Amino acid sequence: MIGWLLDTNVIAALINRNGAPSVKNWAATQDETCMFLSILTLGEYDKGIENLPPDDPNRYVYGAARDALEERFSGRVLSLTDNCVRRWGAISGRVKLATSHAPPVIDTMLAATAIEHDLYLVTRNVKDTRFSGAAVFDPWSDDPARFPLSGK
């Protein structure tokens, strides 16, 4: 694997001053240029902002945080390509067949994106991605030494 695709729950832990120490410690040891976001993560921020009442002062705070995140990851925000979407379809079908439950769309889209770009998927949602075929790293509980980067 050449890098890390960060799920929204990882970003939340990193930017929250009370976020999980294990997540913060792991991230502090990584080369940030090897960290990527999916456009879906920015979309999840947009969804959260739009769920707030129009006069909620947090709309501005969360909007500024979302914009700062997009700027910080400039050039490292991955779009959904045709290959990612086709891989997502295959993953979703296999996971549903294996578990008898339809997997969460965003989690399996992230898994497909990670596979397409040779990245570890960094998430706490291991249960939702375990049959995806993606290499999944949970910074809340996994040993980082078991997830080496191979270089670009």
Task: Identify the function of each model-found stretch.
Residues 47-52, 71-120, 150-152:
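Active-site neighborhoods of divalent-metal-dependent phosphate/nucleic-acid chemistry enzymes
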Residues 13-14, 48, 88-91, 132, ...:
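Residues that scaffold the ATP/ADP-binding catalytic core of kinase and kinase-like folds
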Residues 39-40, 81, 125, 140:
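Residues at the C-termini of beta-strands that transition into short coil/loop
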